[in-house]
Regions:
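Charged DNA-binding/catalytic regions of mobile-element recombinases
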Residues: 1-187
Length: 187
């Protein structure tokens, strides 16, 4: 057992282990990744919809704390329609076992799912997003002289671009937002 304790014995509903969804707000994934630049460290915690890989909400912080994870989850929950109770899949990190996170999940009727211990392939969609983000946005850039505030602005701008404009072949060469608009799922 980790130092954070185990607040939920069987955290994964049997039907939850999937990376695809046939409609928005069926299965979400979340994770935290770190960026190190000369000015310090920044942490990103997105909520990604497995329907189309759209980052629905995210938090960026200089501290990987529960407030960061809770903020991204609350931002996503505020967009739920009536009767929508998605599965939210995460790794077994402390953020996802704290009473605050569990309380938000309970309040919004979210079904929690957690990766098996030490099994990063269980959260492959999140790892894939981070890999793409770091290749396109982070690696190969000289971040010398960039303040943390500016870095966070640039990271946020990239995520907005990824959601609204990044063309993805698996979505018929459309961005996640355009894909939803074409299906009549977004305004």
């Amino acid at each position: 057992m980790s130092r954070c304790g185990n607040l939920l014995r069987n955290a994964r509903p049997k039907s939850a282990f999937m990376s695809q969804a046939i409609a928005p707000n069926e299965v979400w994934i979340t994770h935290v990744t770190e960026f190190r630049i000369p000015a310090g460290k920044a942490y990103l915690s997105p909520i990604v919809d497995c329907f189309d890989g759209m980052p629905i909400s995210w938090s960026i912080s200089c501290s990987p704390d529960a407030e960061m994870a809770n903020s991204s989850l609350l931002g996503t929950c505020s967009q739920l329609g009536e009767g929508e109770h998605p599965i939210v899949h995460s790794d077994r990190g402390c953020h996802y076992r704290w009473p605050g996170w569990i309380g938000i999940c309970s309040e919004y009727g979210l079904r929690r799912s957690m990766s098996r211990k030490g099994s990063s392939p269980d959260n492959a969609r999140a790892e894939g997003l981070f890999g793409r983000l770091k290749v396109e946005f982070f690696y190969g850039c000289d971040w010398t002289g960039v303040t943390m505030e500016r870095f966070i602005e640039l990271l946020d701008e990239y995520l907005v671009w990824y959601r609204d404009e990044k063309i993805k072949s698996d979505l018929g060469y459309r961005s996640p937002m355009q894909y939803r608009k074409d299906l009549g799922l977004a305004a």
